[in-house]
Design a protein with these regions (language model features):
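Short, cationic-aromatic polyanion-contact patches
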Residues: 64-83, 139-162
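A short, conserved structural fragment
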Residues: 52-63, 133-142
Length: 193
């Protein structure tokens, strides 16, 4: 590998490591060019591919999510990191049900969520989802009261390590669900993100 290509790869790696958020191809190119490093998008892609190969036998991986590329710990190693975080990342069953309904039925109103869940949606759940930046208001339904329409955000996709909402697993058919299966799927491990 030519020295310049290896340097570009190292520059890209350092940007991804230090950014604290996913970076788009165009952002990487712009940052490098602002530092006097002439590079086109194809070279950035080659650098990312080389990084992906370099990490194949390590605990790190290059991941493409909804808002760009990021470095992260592979899932196989995430259990080792749980003691580093004091924040409890477990989500309540009601929060999980609410975000699931929004993800699969978006755009959806609070009333529609309540109709599907069969119980009232707590203001704290909606606030929690908004504070996590997992949902946002996309508009208002043209009905009496003009209820807010909720959709998921790119942050939600990033935290689930997916690029687009269609990457979510399909919903099982209604008759295929037993109550035990519904209860067993109410936890997401966010520590690897």
């Amino acid at each position: 590998m030519p020295l310049m290509n290896r340097n570009i790869e190292n520059f890209i790696e350092s940007l991804l490591f230090a950014s604290g958020r996913p970076l788009r191809l165009s952002e990487i190119r712009t940052i490098l060019e602002n530092e006097g490093i002439r590079v086109d998008l194809a070279e950035v892609k080659v650098g990312l591919n080389n990084l992906e190969e370099r990490y194949a036998d390590t605990s790190l991986e290059l991941s493409e999510v909804a808002t760009g590329f990021r470095l992260q710990i592979k899932k196989d190693f995430s259990h080792l990191l749980s003691s580093l975080w004091t924040e409890n990342n477990k989500l309540s069953k009601s929060l999980m049900e609410t975000i699931s309904i929004i993800a699969y039925k978006q755009p959806v109103t609070r009333g529609e969520i309540e109709e599907i869940r069969g119980v009232q949606v707590s203001t704290n759940i909606i606030r929690n989802l908004l504070e996590r930046d997992w949902i946002k208001i996309s508009g208002y339904r043209e009905t009496p009261g003009r209820p807010a329409l909720f959709i998921t955000t790119k942050t939600f996709l990033n935290d689930l390590n997916i690029k687009k909402i269609s990457d979510l697993p399909p919903l099982p058919e209604k008759e295929d669900l037993s109550q035990d299966e519904i209860t067993d799927t109410t936890e997401i491990n966010l520590e690897a993100s």
